[in-house]
Every structure is written in C-alpha cells, then in structure tokens.
C-alpha cells in the first residue's frame, strides 16, 4: 500500500480539528440556555431575590470597575493597591470582601422610593388645588350656592 503524502495527513488533521471545533460551537449555541431561560427555571423565591438584588450586583460591578481603573493607573504592584483585601495576606484575611454595603444600598433605595412617593403626592395635591381654584372661578355670578 502506498503511503499517503504528508500534506494529505495534515489536511486530515486540520479537517478533523475543524470538525471538532465546529461541533463544539454548534453544541454551545444550541444547548446553552439564555439568561431568560435560566431565570424562568428558578423557583419563585430565588427569582424574587434575583430581581431584588439585581441593582446591587450592578452597583458592585460598577464599583469593581472603578477599582480596576484606579489600580491600572497606579505604579504599585496589583496586590498592594486598591481597597480589596488579599486573602493571601494575614492582616487582610478578615476584611470584608463586599464592594457595596448591602444595608446602606437598600436603605438609600427605600429612601429614594419614599421621596418619590412624597413628591408624587405633593404634585397630586397641587393639581387638586389648581382644579378647585379653576372650578371656583368658573361658577356663574347669578348662583348663590
């Protein structure tokens, strides 16, 4: 049996590798659920907690990006900069790893919600007063009541 040329063997290797990579991509696209599908599979309690803490996670991500920008602008080594404690250093092991204080975040969120409700009720009160004044001005001069 004649031996195949070297380029033919390498072509088979690249073809097989391409098939494996292509199969992996196709399986990844078809099998992996979307974010909405994952959230819909959660239990109602976990879904409610997920929705409740969504803004907190976004705030933490925003804070982390600020720290990363500050750290990248610094000339110090990465393990010596930033407010995040390293778990490898003894004196920093027990530091809080939270980037955003959850209680403070929820408290300020509730305060903002209360302020919005108060402003809405004040605006509604002003609207009622305006309507009453308009109604009073529209009364006829010949009516006594």
UniProtKB/Swiss-Prot annotation:
From the record, give the cysteines joined by S-S bonds: none
Coiled coil, from the record: 107-132
Q: What domain of life? A: Eukaryota
Q: Do you know which Pfam families this protein is assigned to?
A: CBP4 (PF07960)
Q: Mind telling me which InterPro entries this protein's record contains?
A: Cbp4
Cellular compartments annotated? Mitochondrion inner membrane
Q: Which GO terms describe its cellular component?
A: mitochondrial inner membrane
Q: What stretches pass through the bilayer?
A: 10-28
A GO BP entry is: mitochondrial respiratory chain complex III assembly
Q: Which PANTHER family match?
A: ASSEMBLY FACTOR CBP4
What is the role of the protein in this entry? Essential for the assembly of ubiquinol-cytochrome c reductase. It has a direct effect on the correct occurrence of the Rieske protein, core 4, core 5 and apocytochrome b.
> What is the similarity comment for this entry?
Belongs to the CBP4 family.
Question: What is the recorded name of this protein?
Answer: Assembly factor CBP4
The gene coding this protein: CBP4
């Amino acid at each position: 049996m004649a031996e195949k040329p070297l380029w033919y063997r390498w072509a088979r290797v690249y073809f097989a590798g391409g098939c494996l990579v292509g199969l992996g991509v196709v399986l990844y696209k078809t099998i992996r659920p979307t974010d909405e599908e994952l959230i819909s599979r959660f239990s109602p309690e976990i879904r409610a907690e997920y929705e409740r803490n969504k803004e907190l996670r976004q705030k933490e991500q925003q804070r982390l990006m600020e720290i990363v920008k500050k750290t990248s602008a610094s000339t110090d080594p990465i393990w010596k900069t930033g407010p995040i404690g390293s778990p490898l250093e003894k004196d920093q092991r027990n530091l809080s790893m939270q980037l955003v204080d959850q209680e403070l975040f929820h408290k300020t969120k509730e305060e903002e919600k209360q302020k919005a409700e108060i402003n809405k009720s004040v605006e509604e009160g002003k609207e009622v007063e305006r309507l009453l004044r308009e109604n009073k001005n529209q009364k006829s001069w010949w009516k006594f009541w």
